[in-house]
Amino acid sequence: MFSGSIPALVTPFRDGAFDEKLFRGFVDWQIAEGSSALVPCGTTGESATMSIEEHNHVVRVCIEQAQGRVPVIAGCGSNDTAVALEHMKAAQAAGADAALVVLPYYNRPNQDGLIAHFRHLTDNCTLPIIVYNVPARTVTDILPETLGALAGIKTIVGIKDASGKVERVSAQRQHCGPDFCQLSGNDDMALGFMAMGGVGCISVTANVAPGLCAEFQTACADGRWADALALQDKLFPLHAALFSDASPGPVKYALTRTYRDFPADLRLPMTWPSEASRAAVDAALAHAGIA
């Protein structure tokens, strides 16, 4: 259902407010560069510091601007099941193709709680769900056997796996079947992830290098592993540099270097990346031939 290079879109703010005009142009550029789907209001989009109304507005704008050219997977996660459902219903009404639903964070449910959370969402909304597993942020990890139990639900169609454990791809194939959509959530591990059966990456780096990331994904899908490895070598310093300080600070800094009039604006508690981080981004952009 979903595959290829899928940017987890940044949300541009200017003087603290959503810069809708720039965002619409950014969506067009991403599609023109070969991104195969778009994810607004994920972690990289600073969804944690948006109001519910603002969050839903950004999702609507993304869907409007995409105009059906590529699927839109709306960020809909919350540690409050009722709020996650509210986001899903709003995204479905706006025309989203799927919801990206992060595991509930901070309150740390057990595996039974995770099943109950996702069953409540699927019982009350028919929008397809991609489960988002990122234990480093949520302090909760969905186990392959738990995911397998959820994979039997028609509207749970895939996972964004940012567990950092590439062997999970094989374990999840065993529990969920080979047709369950597995998307890497780590740019730096995407090559191994794809080789083991993944079908794409929900990417931070694609914000800055959408064309190269799309080319990398196409090479993997075509089985051109030598070409994919060459692109991995080209992009790897950028994958690392974009996490050399708290994300999405480095990726927004990179965009001020590479994308016209991109605003240098983050919402607290996020702050601008350090001088060392900015230098790492500069060097990585040069290595990738972007700036």
UniProtKB/Swiss-Prot annotation:
What GO terms in the biological process aspect are recorded for it?
Answer: diaminopimelate biosynthetic process; lysine biosynthetic process via diaminopimelate
Q: Which is a Gene Ontology cellular component entry for this protein?
A: cytosol
Q: Which gene encodes it?
A: dapA
- Function description: Catalyzes the condensation of (S)-aspartate-beta-semialdehyde [(S)-ASA] and pyruvate to 4-hydroxy-tetrahydrodipicolinate (HTPA).
Similarity comment? Belongs to the DapA family.
Question: For pyruvate, which residues are the binding ones?
Answer: T44, I202
- Which residues are annotated as site, described as Part of a proton relay during catalysis? T43, Y106
Active site feature? Y132 (proton donor/acceptor), K160 (schiff-base intermediate with substrate)
Write down the NCBIfam families for this protein, in alphabetical order.
dapA
Organism, scientific name: Rhizorhabdus wittichii (strain DSM 6014 / CCUG 31198 / JCM 15750 / NBRC 105917 / EY 4224 / RW1) (Sphingomonas wittichii)
Coiled coil (residue ranges): none
Broad class of the protein's primary localization: cytoplasm
* Family matches, as HAMAP family: DapA (MF_00418)
What PANTHER family would the database entry show?
4-HYDROXY-2-OXOGLUTARATE ALDOLASE, MITOCHONDRIAL, DIHYDRODIPICOLINATE SYNTHASE
Pathway per the UniProt entry: Amino-acid biosynthesis; L-lysine biosynthesis via DAP pathway; (S)-tetrahydrodipicolinate from L-aspartate: step 3/4
EC annotation from Swiss-Prot or TrEMBL: 4.3.3.7
Q: Tell me what reaction this enzyme catalyses.
A: L-aspartate 4-semialdehyde + pyruvate = (2S,4S)-4-hydroxy-2,3,4,5-tetrahydrodipicolinate + H2O + H(+)
The record's annotation in PROSITE patterns points to: DHDPS_1, DHDPS_2
What is known about its subunit structure?
A: Homotetramer; dimer of dimers.
Task: Could you list this entry's UniProt keywords, alphabetically sorted.
Answer: Amino-acid biosynthesis, Cytoplasm, Diaminopimelate biosynthesis, Lyase, Lysine biosynthesis, Schiff base
Q: What is this protein called?
A: 4-hydroxy-tetrahydrodipicolinate synthase
**GO molecular-function annotation terms?**
4-hydroxy-tetrahydrodipicolinate synthase activity
